[in-house]
Amino acid sequence: MAEKIRITLIDNSEREVLQGTTTTQIAASISTSLAKKALAARFNGQMIDLSQPLLEDGRLEIITAENEAEALELVRHDYAHILAEAVQKLFPGTQITFGPVTDDGFYYDFAPKDRPFTEEDLPLIEAEMRKIIAQNNALVREVWERDKLISLWESQGEKFKAEWAKELPEGQELTIYRAGEWFDMCRGPHLPSTGKLDPKAFKLTRVSGAYWRGDQNNAMLSRIYGTGWLNAKQLKAHLERLEEAQKRDHRRLGQEMDLFHLQQEAQGSVFWHPNGYTIWLQLEAYLRRRMKNANYKEVKTPQLMDAALWEASGHWGKFRENMFVVPDEIPSTDPDKPVLSGKGNLMALKPMNCPAHIQIFKQGIRSYRELPLRMLEFGCCHRNEAHGALHGLMRVRQLTQDDAHIFCTAEQIVTETKDFVNLLDSIYRDLGFTSYAVKLSLRPELRAGDDELWDNAENGLRSALEQVGITDYEELPGEGAFYGPKLEFHLTDAIGRTWQCGTLQLDYVLPERLDASYVAEDGSRKRPVMLHRAIIGTFERFIGILIEHHAGRFPLWMAPVQAVVATIVSEADSFAESVVEKMKAAGLRVVSDIRNEKINYKIREHSLTKVPNILVVGKREAEEGKVAIRKLGSRDQIILSVDEAIALLLEEATPPDLK
């Protein structure tokens, strides 16, 4: 007879059940409605299927749609499997690879027999997926011996699945999930059946190419993306967000507003146009003022440095593949045969600024009286990102960071963290962001330092957060770097998307590797703690975020063109030009539009480029020395004298830190 086991439920109530009882049975014993709503379970911290037998004492949480994060993970996983099944039914001979869940959906990579998939195939595949959902096939977990599964894959011509399985240890048991006749290798868990999915809550969105295992030397596959939700209402809301995101796409607005461009000859590097660079300069000037007021010392360090420094810092071993490396060469008389200098040294463009900042710290003898030392650089770095990963301003190869490093003692960590978080919060609010989430990455399994060091570091960050009123942060066990815990700050933009921008990383290792020290109060030499910190991250990416957050409608202090003086008749041209000159002299960024075009055409054109203010002048305004101010997006206008208009615009155009 089966033994009894003790199951603790989420409300801490306990039940004794027979060993081998399933979550389905336990849910049914609680209530019929719970049994119907149940999707999966978490048992002793592990996600499991409802049908998986429980073999030991443990804590059980029954997952329903109310557990939205877990439920979405489950349904998207199932949609990916159903996508693969549908494709193989419609396109016989297609080989399957893998299909993970993404932030808002799923994708699956295929090796088609005849041709790559196109967007024209998607409606047909969607229809087949709905048929599979309607069949309500049970999703059954099976355990197979590795070698038998490999033989099966090979007999079916599934070379990619077979290749993957062959790399797993011999004798290892593998799990598959079967839905009717179709199955796929998968760890699970899955919903009880395909009928648990809402057939109106998913949509296939696009296709692309992808290399097998992400290696360009491997076969090119066809990737199909989809988005999946718990119900049709969620899908509709998501598609509306996507539509809004497309309207705000920084690449489209960047072109419409003449901010920047990218081109093939400089992949991953940005050509900033005058309008875009004006935004950059305003942002940089604002940050420079804020950092100066917070007692940061700005520095400038070389972009090209010897590989020996990167070896000493540890970046060479861990980051070399992402670095642009050049030999230290001396040109020869034969242009086809460059001659290496004596040692044939390798140089590398810096991917980050921290080793260079330590070199400045090491110049001369540092005293504890100088700490904390806050060192800032708007440092240009280069990272050799894969071509396929590049994306507008959001992922580039040449990037400029608002990078700073705080050298301090262990006792100063809490105070410095508090000051940093307060500064970050103030800057985000100035830039139009009122909401952000905080995550604390904790010690990984492999780490430098002992448990006491990590206890103090992690508790110090917790204490600092709580002292500034942040109590709902998320802890991420095992996600910290090997050299220290980290805080991450994730902004929420105007349409609800999150962007990880700010970081504060404790580092006990790099100062030791690069032999940084200071003279302590007792005369001994000690290592400083190094706090790597950023607020906006990189200028390129953050400006992309700003463009999309504001939909191109920048606050006046940051707008590249703050006003256009547009004429109705040619008799007002000279007056318009005099207004522009007077406003420029006052410090405003203003241009004139005296073209022989109708005023409505001019207004429409400048509205498309998101100019915040259009100052309309006709014959009457010119005679009276006035302008009619029309705000972007408004049909109303106010009539002011030129001096009144200048005063109004100057007040609105004052950066938030100078008000």
From Swiss-Prot:
Pfam families with a match to the protein in the record: HGTP_anticodon (PF03129), TGS (PF02824), tRNA-synt_2b (PF00587), tRNA_SAD (PF07973)
Enzyme class: ligase
Binding site residues for Zn(2+): C354, H405, H532
EC numbers on record: 6.1.1.3
Function: Catalyzes the attachment of threonine to tRNA(Thr) in a two-step reaction: L-threonine is first activated by ATP to form Thr-AMP and then transferred to the acceptor end of tRNA(Thr). Also edits incorrectly charged L-seryl-tRNA(Thr).
HAMAP family in the cross-refs: Thr_tRNA_synth
Protein name, as recorded: Threonine--tRNA ligase
Organism: Zymomonas mobilis subsp. mobilis (strain ATCC 31821 / ZM4 / CP4)
